Amino acid sequence: MLQPKRTKYRKQQKGRVTGVATRGHRIAFGSFAIKSLEGGWITARQIEAARIAMTRAMKREGQVWIRVFPDKPITQKPAEVRMGKGKGAPEYWVACIKPGTILFESGGVSIETAQESLRLAAQKLPFKTKFIVRPDYVAS
């Protein structure tokens, strides 16, 4: 599972996901990608599930790039604990995703294989996504 090796602070405030992505919104590494159409949080487990779905569908050929990293700790109090007594312990990690962010990229495979593998990955994610192709892509 993805998580930071060390952080300056153990806990963070919730915050809001506002606006659209101005960084990480173009294909940088591969020829194909999935782009988020909605904002929200994606957990480290969801990223890992999508990565496994992609690599299985691609049958270990080509390459996969994960463009998001879960760097925000989400805290939770234990079950049946009264309110108060401070904030809960960090439970899992999320990445804050704005609309337009590139989530996963792939390359080195045919467009049909890439489309199918990214479709399977998109099913594991908590928001709507879109399959995109690099503008200068030429099928070989």
Curated annotation (Swiss-Prot):
PROSITE patterns: RIBOSOMAL_L16_1 (PS00586), RIBOSOMAL_L16_2 (PS00701). GO terms for biological process: translation. One of its GO terms (molecular function) is tRNA binding. Pfam families: Ribosomal_L16. The keyword Ribosomal protein applies. Keywords: Ribonucleoprotein, Ribosomal protein, RNA-binding, rRNA-binding, tRNA-binding. InterPro entries: Ribosomal_uL16, Ribosomal_uL16_bact-type, Ribosomal_uL16_CS, Ribosomal_uL16_dom, Ribosomal_uL16_sf. One of its GO terms (cellular component) is cytosolic large ribosomal subunit. Coiled coil: none annotated. Gene3D superfamilies: Ribosomal protein L10e/L16. Part of the 50S ribosomal subunit. Belongs to the universal ribosomal protein uL16 family. Binds 23S rRNA and is also seen to make contacts with the A and possibly P site tRNAs. This is Large ribosomal subunit protein uL16.
